[in-house]
Amino acid sequence: MSGDNAMKSFSTGMPWGVRLPGLLLCLLLGTLVILPAGPLAAEGSRTLYPEDIAGARANLEWRVSTYGDFVLRRTLLRVYAEAGEYLLLGSSAVDVPEVPDEGDILVYTPGVVTGPIGNTTIDGDPAFSCREQRAETGNEAQGRINDRTEELAGPRTIADPGDATPGDTIPDGYIPCFYQVPETGIYAVVFYGPAGPGEDYEGTPNGEIELKEIPDEQGTSVAMWDVTVRASLTSTNDIQGRLFTYYLTLFTGENDRPLWSVVYVVSSDGYIYEIDLRGMDPNGFVLFANRQGFLDSDGKRLYRDVLAKPGMSFQAQNQLMELQGNTNLAGPDFPIFFNRPATATLQALDIPLEPEPPQVSNFQFIGTDDNVTRVGAGGTFRFTSNVDGTYQLVISRDGTNFDPTNPRNAVLRGFVTEGVNTVAWDGLADNGDPLPIGQ
């Protein structure tokens, strides 16, 4: 987060406890609150900043710099669409005065974007460019969201695709660029700010939500943007729950500009998180979700915030290029939706529609010496999990305090797979002392 050179971590879970002779422990498997899938509103900046929302606006970024030396400061959007449907696209960075030729909206077909999330590679040319379509239609208003009224109204219908003449419905909306999807799949959508694709100039966003005109100095960011899926150019029915990303890089322009947006994170086992920013004031930041959070110097989960090293330049600190204590960032894992995800989108991502709660069975501890547990000798835990995921196993020194941050306890963490899992333990607490015989 650019505001305080820190990044914060959140986690939730449900403990599962067991008492064995000589051992007192607690096993934690991650669990989430389930939210039903279904539509809410349109897809884009009007979703993040709906009518009457409080606080400030954060612009969508596309820059060449990174967070943590590997998460590019560019929001690569993804949208599930079925053959014959239309993507309707608009941006406040299209045809901006002074720099009319740099802002653009691009669409890439399935399979063109490859590589690890956070540092992806675009291996081919775009299938669509809003700027090129504007040149073909000759409609200078096409693809540009001019103000808050047009942002909230969304895309107008198109009566004549040849010159992008709008229909009479949704008169307060913007005239969209449009792309008809040739095949069913997940498409990538890129928004370039007025500075173009190869710059790192952040501009000076004003953070205003109620924009009455295209804001100056968007730089490498976009204030108002929209990706709407409809069945046809004349339809007024938005097909929702289709748009997502694996991480958001956003920029308010400065601090004291709180954010109140809501997004939805879906884990690979089908649970849905509703994430409410609740007035967070980060300035420039990246938002993503993963299995591990932040990592300690030994690669284990940290369960704490991370801070930039103070000796670096101001910009390097803001972008967390090196972290105190040789801690690290684990990369993004899970998709972030702007509405509750549509069933078809989850199916395309191979995410189950009905999540299965994690359960542990057949829990055993096997000592190192003919199944005899001696002080300081340790042994192996064996248990069966019904799902893939992560675990935290806390061995309490006194049977009362199961705090994983207490160095007098022993904490084991890692990944589990569906089926039988084994976890080795050296018999020591986190402070290096042997744990005594349990009471």
Regions found by a protein language model. Name each.
Residues 21-35:
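Bacterial N-terminal signal peptides
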Residues 17, 23, 38-41:
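Intrinsically disordered, low-complexity segments enriched in proline/serine/threonine
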Residues 40-418, 430-439:
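Long, compositionally biased, intrinsically disordered segments
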Residues 1-18:
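N-terminal secretory signal peptides that target proteins for export/translocation
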